[in-house]
C-alpha cells in the first residue's frame, strides 16, 4: 500500500513539473491572419490605423483598419502600402 501511494505521489509530482511554462494558450492571440491581399490601393483618407499580422500566420501582411472599422489585408511589399505606413507613422 505504501509503495502504491509513493508511486502515485511521484507520478503526480512529475506530471505537475511537465506542465508548460507558458500558461497562455496560442488561441489567446486574436490577431487575424490574411490569406489574400487587396488588389488595388485604398483611398488614404479611409484608413485610420494599421497593424501587422502575427508571426504565427503563414502570410505576412499589413492589416489596414478603415474609418468604418473594416479590416483590409495588404501586401507589405507593395509601394503604396509602405507609403501609407510611413504616412500613418508621421501623423
From Swiss-Prot:
Pfam families: IL8
Gene3D superfamilies: 2.40.50.40
Endpoints of the signal sequence: 1-23
GO molecular function terms attached to this record: CCR1 chemokine receptor binding; CCR5 chemokine receptor binding; chemoattractant activity; chemokine activity; chemokine receptor antagonist activity; phosphatidylinositol-4,5-bisphosphate phospholipase C activity; phospholipase activator activity; protein homodimerization activity
Sorted UniProt keywords: Chemotaxis, Cytokine, Disulfide bond, Inflammatory response, Secreted, Signal
GO terms, biological process: antimicrobial humoral immune response mediated by antimicrobial peptide; calcium ion transport; cell-cell signaling; cellular response to fibroblast growth factor stimulus; cellular response to interleukin-1; cellular response to tumor necrosis factor; cellular response to type II interferon; cellular response to virus
Gene Ontology CC: cytoplasm; extracellular space
CDD domains named among the record's database cross-references: Chemokine_CC
Disulfide bonds listed in the record: 33-57, 34-73
Matching SMART domains: SCY
SUPFAM superfamilies in the cross-refs: Interleukin 8-like chemokines
UniProt subcellular location: Secreted
General function of this protein: Chemoattractant for blood monocytes, memory T-helper cells and eosinophils. Causes the release of histamine from basophils and activates eosinophils. May activate several chemokine receptors including CCR1, CCR3, CCR4 and CCR5. May also be an agonist of the G protein-coupled receptor GPR75. Together with GPR75, may play a role in neuron survival through activation of a downstream signaling pathway involving the PI3, Akt and MAP kinases. By activating GPR75 may also play a role in insulin secretion by islet cells.
Family affiliation: Belongs to the intercrine beta (chemokine CC) family.
Protein name: C-C motif chemokine 5
Lineage, broadest ranks: Eukaryota, Metazoa, Chordata, Craniata, Vertebrata
